[in-house]
């Protein structure tokens, strides 16, 4: 199963994102397929924070448009909701130790721990996931 990161969702959603032209076709194929994928709620929160932020986008996504994207993706029959499981803190500690993670790498470690807990591969444009040796990281074709 794939766990999608906020940067992949932003690239798929925003036509002005530098990676939109390559990520969107990959994303459309994911939605058209039957393979399960997940987006944890904390990733959706990050997506909404970034997509609607005037400091990031000259013309941010209207909140209603950003929520419509969230609702369209989560309505897919092969989208499976996931959130931190009962072993999350133990996995987070292990991954932080493995990658010597602190500061800005902690949110990536949180996603990595969710991915490990649910046997997912992380799909992200962020190369920092390569620092977690026990996490399978996939970059969409660019």
From Swiss-Prot:
Gene induction: Induced in persister cells in response to D-cycloserine.
InterPro entries tied to this protein: Mtu_PIN, PIN-like_dom_sf, PIN_dom, VapC_family
Alphabetized Gene3D superfamilies for the sequence: 5'-nuclease
A Gene Ontology BP annotation from the UniProt entry: negative regulation of growth
EC number: 3.1.-.-
Top-level taxon of the source organism: Bacteria
A molecular-function term among this protein's GO annotations: magnesium ion binding
Kinase in keyword set: no
Domain PINc: 3-139
Co-factor requirement: Mg(2+)
Entry keywords, A to Z: Hydrolase, Magnesium, Metal-binding, Nuclease, Toxin-antitoxin system
Residues involved in Mg(2+) binding: 5, 108
Record-given protein name: Ribonuclease VapC31
Originating organism: Mycobacterium tuberculosis (strain ATCC 25618 / H37Rv)
